[in-house]
A protein has these predicted regions:
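Short, intrinsically disordered, mixed-charge
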Residues: 33-36, 72-76, 124
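Generic structural detector for well-ordered beta-strands
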Residues: 19-22, 86, 135-137
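Catalytic strand-loop segment that frames the active site of acyl-thioester-processing enzymes
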Residues: 1-56
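Short, intrinsically disordered/low-complexity patches at protein termini
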Residues: 39-41, 80-82, 87-88, 117, ...
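HotDog/MaoC-like acyl-thioester-processing domains
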Residues: 1-15, 90-139
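Hydrophobic beta-strand-centered segment that forms part of the acyl-chain substrate-binding groove
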Residues: 49-58, 62-103
C-alpha cells in the first residue's frame, strides 16, 4: 500500500469509493458472530418487526467497519490519526452501500501535514446512513 503524500491531494478531491452489497442476512449473522452482538433486531425478522422495524437491520458497527475498509483501502492504518462517525439511518438487508469521501481541508499543524476528509455511507438510493470524519497524517 502506498503512503499518502500531502502534495498529491487538494481540497475538494474525492478519495476512492467503495461499493458493498447488496447486504445479505448472512453478512449480519457473520458480523454478529464476530462481534458478539446477537441482538435479535439484526437476525430475527419477526422480532425486528415486533419492535417496529421494517425487518432486520444491519449492525451500525458493521456499516462503520465497511467505512473503515474504504479508509484503509486508501490510506495505510499507520497514517490514520482520527476516524469517527455519526449514525444517521438504518441499513437494511438488500441495500447496496456506497462509501464516499472528500478532502475538505489540508493543513499543517505542529509539523504534521494533515488531510481532513468527510466520509459518507449511503445506500444506492442516496439515503445517507452514516457520516464520518477522518484525519490522515500525510507525508
Amino acid at each position: 500500500m502506498n503512503k499518502i503524500k500531502f502534495a498529491d491531494y487538494n481540497e475538494g478531491q474525492d478519495i476512492p469509493e467503495l461499493r458493498v452489497g447488496p447486504i445479505k442476512q448472512m453478512d449480519l449473522v457473520r458480523y454478529a458472530g464476530a462481534s458478539g452482538d446477537f441482538n435479535p433486531i439484526h437476525n430475527d425478522v419477526e422480532f425486528a418487526k415486533s419492535a417496529g422495524l421494517p425487518g432486520t437491520i444491519a449492525h451500525g458497527m458493521y456499516i462503520m467497519a465497511l467505512m473503515g475498509r474504504q479508509v484503509t483501502n486508501w490510506a495505510p492504518p499507520t497514517q490514520v490519526k482520527f476516524f469517527g462517525v455519526k449514525f444517521k439511518g438504518m441499513s437494511l438487508p438488500g441495500e447496496t452501500m456506497v462509501f464516499t469521501g472528500k478532502i475538505k481541508k489540508k493543513k499543517e499543524e505542529n509539523g504534521d501535514k494533515l488531510l481532513m476528509v468527510s466520509l459518507t455511507a449511503a445506500n444506492d438510493k442516496g439515503e445517507v446512513k452514516v457520516s464520518g470524519d477522518l484525519t490522515v497524517k500525510a507525508e
